[in-house]
Amino acid sequence: MTKHRVVVGLSGGVDSAVTAHLLKQQGHEVVGIFMKNWEDDDDSEFCSSRQDFLDAASVADVIGIEIEHVNFAAEYKDRVFAEFLREYQAGRTPNPDVLCNAEIKFKAFLDHAMRLGAEKIATGHYARVRQNPATGLFELLKGLDPSKDQSYFLHRLNQAQLSKTLFPVGDLHKTEVRRIAADIGLPNAKKKDSTGICFIGERPFREFLNRYIQHAPGPILDDRGRKLGRHVGLSFYTLGQRQGLGIGGVKEKGAQRGAGDHAPWFVARKELETNTLRVVQGHEHPWLLSHRLDAQDASWIAGHPPAAGACAAKTRYRQQDAACTVLAAQGDAFSLQFPEAQWAVTPGQSAVLYDGEVCLGGGVIAAVNG
């Protein structure tokens, strides 16, 4: 195995810690970098960056590597957070983790690592990279642990980025990662996984978004046009949402709806022109199901779109691959047709294409059709 100078993104979590350990065990020259990418709430109870850095520094000490603290807050706010807000203001539901990976972890961080003389970078993502011997192209593969696979969030990476990237824990299951961490005495072996917005942390989302986006309350209507209540602003809702609608006590009587007295309500549409939130009763309501989507701002790992034909796709993280047909893929736009109806396909989220375990790339969902 060729030995490299590898810069590892140490987040303070167990996955990146084991990543650094494995690389050092393989004989690589390993340096750690802790990225601070959000500083608006440094004194907030929800900001964990101080503790995360202390955890990362403790890990570096146990493993025996140097660690550097680097601030990418300006880049994050300009390249990721500004787009995140624009999408919400346009009534869509963005996925900041996808953009953060493409713009910060595998661009700003990669560039910084190269300036430090790195030959490779590594992160604790559950994914894999291989070079196809027939084409010479680098491929992004799903992580071996299906419950932790993060290729969905990495689908915007390109050939240059993948050629410089290592994902050591992509060949492991999470239980193995925690066992390794415990065996070598890492102080964060039992630290829980983070689940908040990329780099912003775990905080009440509506309260957080309210600080940055103007909101206009409006009516909540059902599929018949009946008024059920008022929403607090369309930006605060996403398609398929069930909790937090404030209409839990409004139940439709009668069997004619086919949903029953106590069937839950789901967000089905956001009508920006009239500032109206549309909700429907029942998980399988036709308004929640679609067979086709159109996507834009596509990025293809091989550098070109896949040919029209049979494929598989995810329209949300952790979703099982859904069989589909690529109807057209030209430039940065493509369309998919699904033989089985997909539930709550959401504009702003990513549609990511797969050929078996190989991630082909994807784009941002722009429109859906029944």
From Swiss-Prot:
Report the principal subcellular site: cytoplasm
Cystine pairs annotated here are 100-198
Q: Does the keyword Transferase apply?
A: yes
Region named Interaction with target base in tRNA: 95-97
Question: Which CDD domains does the entry link to?
Answer: MnmA_TRMU-like
Q: Annotated site (Interaction with tRNA), which positions?
A: 125, 349
Q: In Gene Ontology terms, what is a biological process of this protein?
A: tRNA wobble position uridine thiolation
As for subcellular location, the record says:
Cytoplasm
Q: Which residues form the active site?
A: 100 (nucleophile), 198 (cysteine persulfide intermediate)
Name the UniProt record assigns to this protein: tRNA-specific 2-thiouridylase MnmA
- Species of the source: Acidovorax ebreus (strain TPSY) (Diaphorobacter sp. (strain TPSY))
The root-end lineage is: Bacteria, Pseudomonadati, Pseudomonadota, Betaproteobacteria, Burkholderiales
Per the record, the gene is mnmA
